[in-house]
Amino acid sequence: HNSASVLTPAGATPWKGAMSKDISVTLNTEGVYVYECTPHKMMAMVGVIKVGSATNLDKIKQNSQNYKRAFVMNKDRLDKYLSEL
């Protein structure tokens, strides 16, 4: 597994961790971040982080529509996570 950012607030620094290695990320830009396990993207192995206010939530939801096309399992997982913000 790894952790890699896929959708971030404007101006945020993206990250991509190496396979099977720990990663530490400092998030300094307010908003919603979506990250994935790159080799397991098709299974919707994703997560969501909210830093401060969800100032970019509408943009993330819009951009996630195209991103989710790669999911073959758990197709509603990201929508569920975003709905909890």
What is each PLM-predicted segment?
Residues H1-L85:
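Extracytoplasmic copper-binding redox domains, predominantly the cupredoxin/blue-copper superfamily
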